[in-house]
UniProtKB/Swiss-Prot annotation:
It is a multi-pass membrane protein. Residues 10-25 have a biased composition (Basic and acidic residues). Pathway: Protein modification; protein ubiquitination. PROSITE patterns: ZF_RING_2. It comes from the Eukaryota. Keywords: Membrane, Metal-binding, Transferase, Transmembrane, Transmembrane helix, Ubl conjugation pathway, Zinc, Zinc-finger. Residues 1-32 are annotated as: Disordered. This is E3 ubiquitin protein ligase RIE1. The lineage of its organism: Eukaryota, Viridiplantae, Streptophyta, Embryophyta, Tracheophyta. One of its GO terms (molecular function) is zinc ion binding. The chain crosses the membrane at residues 77-97, 110-130, 176-196, 211-231, 232-252.
Length: 359
């Protein structure tokens, strides 16, 4: 683990948070973030990186999942999702009404009807979750405003627990609907193939509508699988790209430039300073900020002289930042991370609150 080799425990107790502790009432859009995501667990099993770097990648995977869910329930995406599925429901209804004279040799009409009902159920789930998120956000903002006026402490933990329960129920319903849709797709594919030319001749409109629905599902399934593979490869091989992406879409969860200026800044000096571009055991020499030296010189062991974000060893002269929890990283790497999330990527220590994020 990238930690200082001397007096790390005592130094941790002496460090105070950059800012005084504050209540954070923001409810994470992903209530399941308290548990490792499937992608994070998979990364932990298939990659060969050592433990600290794997922790960073699992944290990045959870952050990416939270961003994905937040983006998935944004107004434009929800509107597009509802309109798309509503169009499928409308197409199913119009086709079922307009083809009453067709007599297919397979129960393809039943398949189209159930397919439309599944789309409608998906619309209900998406809208209910979107409405719940907006209602919770408005209620929380109003409660926070009122409680600030009257110095009343708001029970954010209870609010988060209630929302987690509701979110879990919606997720279970969506998962069940996805499984049923997959099974129903297989049944529809079988009926279309079994019907063959006879189905095409007796009910051409129903046949082609079924083929279109099946093709749409295949397209989205392939797209999601390819996207998940690309994200997994990026997390394993190019974490800085993921951090840059998260930083580009980050909200207000990170730290400001003024808060970053409080962090101790070091320059790594290899023990064999007469050789250039050498990596390995060395020491962290503090760099004065505004004429003040905020830290003391630290010695690093060989296994600690690398950055767990970019997986690169510290080169002689590299600038490093150290967090109050004693973990250290390349300055450029950790600055991008902290602007996205105000927690240590290894131990989840929140540099604003002075506490460890248990999620």
């Amino acid at each position: 683990m990238s930690s200082y080799s001397s007096d790390s425990t005592a130094a941790r107790d002496q460090h105070a948070p950059l800012l005084r502790p504050r209540h954070d009432g923001s409810f994470s859009s992903s209530s399941s973030s308290a548990r490792p995501t499937a992608l994070a667990v998979l990364l932990g099993r298939i990659t060969g990186h050592r433990a600290p770097s794997m922790l960073v990648r699992e944290t990045a995977a959870r952050a990416l999942e939270e961003r994905r869910i937040d983006w998935g329930y944004s107004k434009p995406v929800v509107a597009a999702d509802i309109l798309w599925n509503a169009a499928l429901v409308l197409a199913s209804a119009v086709m079922l009404v307009g083809t009453v004279e067709e007599r297919p040799n397979e129960p393809i009409r039943v398949w189209i009807c159930v397919y439309g009902l599944q789309c409608l159920f998906h619309v209900v789930l998406v809208w209910s979750e979107y409405w719940r998120r907006n209602s919770t956000r408005r209620a929380r903002d109003l409660e926070s405003y009122d409680h600030e006026d009257y110095n009343i402490e708001y029970d954010y933990e209870q609010d988060s627990d209630d929302n987690s329960t509701t979110y879990s129920f919606v997720k279970r319903c969506e998962s069940i609907n996805t499984v049923i849709s997959f099974i129903w797709w297989i049944i529809g594919f079988y009926w279309v193939v079994e019907g063959g030319d006879k189905l095409l001749g007796e009910a051409p409109n129903l046949y082609w509508l079924s083929v279109i629905f099946l093709a749409i599902d295949v397209f989205f399934a392939v797209f999601c699988v390819v996207l998940a593979c690309l994200v997994g490869i990026a997390l394993c091989c190019c974490l800085p790209c993921i951090i840059a992406l998260l930083y580009a879409v980050a909200g207000t969860e990170g730290v400001s430039e003024a808060e970053l200026g409080v962090l101790p800044l070091y320059k790594f000096k290899a023990f064999h300073s007469n050789e250039k571009n050498i990596t390995g055991p060395g020491k962290m020499v503090p760099i004065p900020i505004n004429g003040l030296c905020l830290a003391t010189e630290r010695t690093l062991l060989a296994e600690d002289a690398d950055c767990c974000i970019c997986l690169s060893s510290y080169e002689d002269g590299a600038e490093l930042h150290a967090l109050p929890c004693n973990h250290h990283f390349h300055s450029t790497c950790i600055v991008k991370w902290l602007k996205m999330r105000a927690t240590c990527p290894l131990c989840k220590y929140n540099i604003l609150k002075g506490t460890t994020d248990q999620s």
